[in-house]
Amino acid sequence: MDASTKTKKGAGGRKGGGPRKKSVTRSVRAGLQFPVGRVGRFLKKGRYAQRVGTGAPVYLAAVLEYLAAEVLELAGNAARDNKKNRISPRHLLLAVRNDEELGKLLAGVTIAYGGVLPNINPVLLPKRKENAAASTPKSPSKAKKSPKKA
């Protein structure tokens, strides 16, 4: 047995010990920011099913990334509306509750330090006097004066 035919230690099952290729993560392959490997590990560790397909963690990571981007965009808009540069839990709550679909998805979720949506029942608001204001003149000088007696 020649020493040249044996594989070198630490070659990872590859023939020879040439330059190693740079590893490409599944997140990069899928074009995602969220970690596909970590999501896959959580799926396996959580025992949601006996087996987990190769596409499942990629799909779930993509869905999570989309939801996070959607919430962050709306929360950023809420922060900008309030003239703030930093997103707070209040901005997250306003973003989620003002969006119909996200509000339905996160209906049972409590956001800590989020507060409540501003809401005043219309019955409690002061009544507008548009009809009365339109029928009476605005200033007494412009009202019809009674004719002067001679």
Swiss-Prot record:
The keyword DNA-binding applies. It comes from Pisum sativum. Its main location: nucleus. Residues 1-26, 128-150 are annotated as: Disordered. The modification N-acetylmethionine is found at M1. A motif (SPKK motif 2) lies at residues 146-149. Belongs to the histone H2A family. Core component of nucleosome. Nucleosomes wrap and compact DNA into chromatin, limiting DNA accessibility to the cellular machineries which require DNA as a template. Histones thereby play a central role in transcription regulation, DNA repair, DNA replication and chromosomal stability. DNA accessibility is regulated via a complex set of post-translational modifications of histones, also called histone code, and nucleosome remodeling. This is Histone H2A.1. SMART domains: H2A (SM00414). InterPro entries: Histone-fold, Histone_H2A, Histone_H2A/H2B/H3, Histone_H2A_C, Histone_H2A_CS. CDD domains: HFD_H2A. Residues 1-24, 141-150 have a biased composition (Basic residues). It is found in: Nucleus; Chromosome. Contains 2 SPKK motifs which may interact with the minor groove of A/T-rich DNA sites. Phosphorylation of this motif may regulate DNA binding. This motif is reiterated in both termini of histone H1 and in the N-terminus of sea urchin histones H2B, but its presence in the C-terminus seems to be unique to plant H2A. The nucleosome is a histone octamer containing two molecules each of H2A, H2B, H3 and H4 assembled in one H3-H4 heterotetramer and two H2A-H2B heterodimers. The octamer wraps approximately 147 bp of DNA. Keywords: Acetylation, Chromosome, DNA-binding, Nucleosome core, Nucleus. High expression in root meristematic tissues, moderate in whole shoot and very low in mature leaves. A motif (SPKK motif 1) lies at residues 139-142. GO terms for cellular component: nucleosome; nucleus. GO terms for molecular function: DNA binding; protein heterodimerization activity; structural constituent of chromatin.
